[in-house]
Amino acid sequence: MSDYKSLKVAELREKLAEKGLSTAGNKAELVSRLTAATESNDENTSNNNATDLGDLAPPEDDIDWGDMENDTISTDVNKPAEPESKETSAPAAAVEIEKENESIISKETSQAPETSTGAEEHQETTEESKQSVSNEVSSPDVAKEQEKLIQRAKRFGIPVDDEQIKKAARAARFGIQQPLASSNNKNHNQSKNPQNRSNSRSKQRNKNAPPKSAPSKRKSNILDDPIEAEKARKRAERFGVAAKN
C-alpha cells in the first residue's frame, strides 16, 4: 500500500517480523510482501464480518482508508520536533561559555594589581636601604673624623687621599683600627729621623742588588793524598810512563 512506501526499510522489516514473514529483500520486495499480507488479512476480516453481520456489514468499497494515511502523515509531521530542542539548547550553551570567559577575564584583572603592588613595595624597600646607607656615610660624626684626619695630614705634610680618609673616618666611627693614622705616624717618624731614612734606603738597595755568589771551593786532587800518589808513581814505573808531579 501507499503508506508502506513512506516507511523506512527497518520499519518495514519490523512489521514483517511482527507478522511472522520473511525480512529479506530490498524495499520494494518488503513493501509488496507487507501489502499482500495486509490485503489477505483484510479479506479474512471482511469475510468474518460478513458472515457475522450478514447484510449489515458495509461493502469493501465503502471503507474509508484516508484515516490511516492521515495517521502516518501526522506521525511524520511530529518527528522533526527533536532538532528544535537541540537548536534551543545551543544558545544556552553559548551563553554559559560567555559567562565562563567573563569570569576568567575578571580573575586576571583582579590578580594584575597584586603583582604591581609587589613591585612597588620592592622598589620602596630598595630606596629606603639606599637612603639609610647615604645617611650613614654623610652623618656628622663621619664628617668630623674626616676633618680631623685632613688637618692631621696637613700638619705633618702628608699627601691627602680622599678615599683613604673616608675609610679611616668610617673605621673610627665604628671603633675599628684606623689604618690612615698608623701609616701617617710611620711616615712621619721615618721623615723625622735621618738615621731611619738612611737605613731604609740601604735596605732598599740591598733588596735591588743581585745576590753574591758563594766562594768556590778548590777542587780536591787525588794526588794530594800520599797513598794515592805512591800508587800512581808505581803504576807509571811499571808501564814506563813518567810520573806527574
Swiss-Prot record:
Region described as Disordered: 32-245
Compositional bias annotation for Polar residues: 109-118
UniProt domain SAP: residue ranges: 4-38
Chain positions found as Phosphoserine: 139
UniProt biased composition (Low complexity): 37-52, 182-196
Keyword match Hydrolase: no
UniProt GO cellular component terms: nucleus
Pfam families: SAP, Tho1_MOS11_C
Source organism, top-level taxon: Eukaryota
Biased amino acid composition, Basic and acidic residues: 119-130
Swiss-Prot/TrEMBL keywords: Phosphoprotein
InterPro entries linked: SAP_dom, SAP_dom_sf, SAP_domain_ribonucleoprotein, THO1_MOS11_C
Gene Ontology terms: biological process: poly(A)+ mRNA export from nucleus
Chain intervals with Acidic residues compositional bias: 58-70
Family: Belongs to the SAP domain-containing ribonucleoprotein family.
Designated name of the protein: Protein mlo1
Organism: Schizosaccharomyces pombe (strain 972 / ATCC 24843)
